[in-house]
Amino acid sequence: MHNDKDLSTWQTFRRLWPTIAPFKAGLIVAGVALILNAASDTFMLSLLKPLLDDGFGKTDRSVLVWMPLVVIGLMILRGITSYVSSYCISWVSGKVVMTMRRRLFGHMMGMPVSFFDKQSTGTLLSRITYDSEQVASSSSGALITVVREGASIIGLFIMMFYYSWQLSIILIVLAPIVSIAIRVVSKRFRNISKNMQNTMGQVTTSAEQMLKGHKEVLIFGGQEVETKRFDKVSNRMRLQGMKMVSASSISDPIIQLIASLALAFVLYAASFPSVMDNLTAGTITVVFSSMIALMRPLKSLTNVNAQFQRGMAACQTLFTILDSEQEKDEGKRVIERATGDVEFRNVTFTYPGRDVPALRNINLKIPAGKTVALVGRSGSGKSTIASLITRFYDIDEGEILMDGHDLREYTLASLRNQVALVSQNVHLFNDTVANNIAYARTEQYSREQIEEAARMAYAIDFINKMDNGLDTVIGENGVLLSGGQRQRIAIARALLRDSPILILDEATSALDTESERAIQAALDELQKNRTSLVIAHRLSTIEKADEIVVVEDGVIVERGTHNDLLEHRGVYAQLHKMQFGQ
């Protein structure tokens, strides 16, 4: 199997073609229009011969009568074909960009959490926006150039051979040299283009970090640090761009030099008597004008290589993501509503790319309808245990059961439908409050159900104070809300979901004492008859748990009720003493 570095441009284009093929009708129309456009230019040059030999040569003055009409007709044809080709190419490009973005977006949504752990958000955004646009714009631009300029070159050569094959043959001899020059710079263009895609992702990441963390930047005086970081990646992008310009600029004069040498040689050959005898003023003008006219399409074809390589380099980057393995969803078991029994049996788990296990030999039973709390110092593995229940990661050893069946037996959709999650890092969408509470299921719930969930989460009071109540758009990630308000909307979302298994990962960490008391009452009600896994830093919130499990360095070191663990005077008792000073 070839990786992206081994794929040739042709192989990459062959992979891209199925994306383009459904819109080939637009390409065909554009191609015909481009050929007619090139033909009109070539035919315009051919008019020089009758104009000079007949019109101004006074052998046929009628040429001067019909010639202006032909010129006007050709210009009208040129304008129409230019519009049609541009419109069709833009239509195809837009369709290709949309298709590629949909494929990328859909594929990324199916990627495991470990994929996003390794990738920066800025880089992935750059792939969806910049790279997909680059594929279409570069490829379509290259197509326009190849078809139009290629047709021009063919037309000009045919006309030159028609009028003087002796002079034209000289240019044919030099054609392989042009091909070699293009081949030499081709590899350079591709390498630089790949570097530009990666550097653009770094620029996006740097800008995104500043924009998302602008408050921290201001508070901690990080303006200079962020400026230096952005300047560094921006300069790297500039240098890559200069390398591309340098390579492109070198290829241009090479082609122009070859064309100039050919033209000079043709001028010299035209002085031979055997050639001069067959040339008229009109013929020599057409031939030389055609040779000069060839320089523009030849130069464009040289540049098109760099343009096409940019598109293929971006395309390879996108295919690298599309070739990445998605989440394994091989389970066949579908369940409407689980009883809620969860059990860990000898579970060991290591995060991808790391050597040291995050969890070792975990054995844990969470009976249906019971509440188990996980406590421990930061980084001990509490949140990791919770993330394994939803199969955000797959375990190395052991098994995790739900209602007596291994989690891997269930379809991912069916499994995750059994779990409601409220974490300390709440993510809200740039949508209305109501749509955030009923996220992904807005048609399933009534307005009254959404309001009731908000009321149970003690969120209805601040929601009603908003300009449009539940219909208020809260901005990206709930930027218009306080931390506590975001947390309460997340709790309302979990309440509305009504799943049999509930995971509360520091769910009340962002709340003030008064709000915490109010929401804790709602959470206590929510946890009734549900299997609840509560991760808490504030030990006061989990004192009533059916069982408290203490995790340290990925290992369960203690378990029991609140009172039992205090009497044991172990790790839990130490944590309790640190918080309450008792």
From Swiss-Prot:
Record-listed E.C. numbers: 7.5.2.6
Species of origin: Shigella sonnei (strain Ss046)
Bilayer topology term: Multi-pass membrane protein
Main location group: membrane
Alphabetic keyword roster: ATP-binding, Cell inner membrane, Cell membrane, Lipid transport, Membrane, Nucleotide-binding, Translocase, Transmembrane, Transmembrane helix, Transport
Protein name as catalogued: ATP-dependent lipid A-core flippase
Spans through the membrane: 16-36, 63-83, 153-173, 253-273, 275-295
Annotated gene: msbA
Domain ABC transporter: 342-578
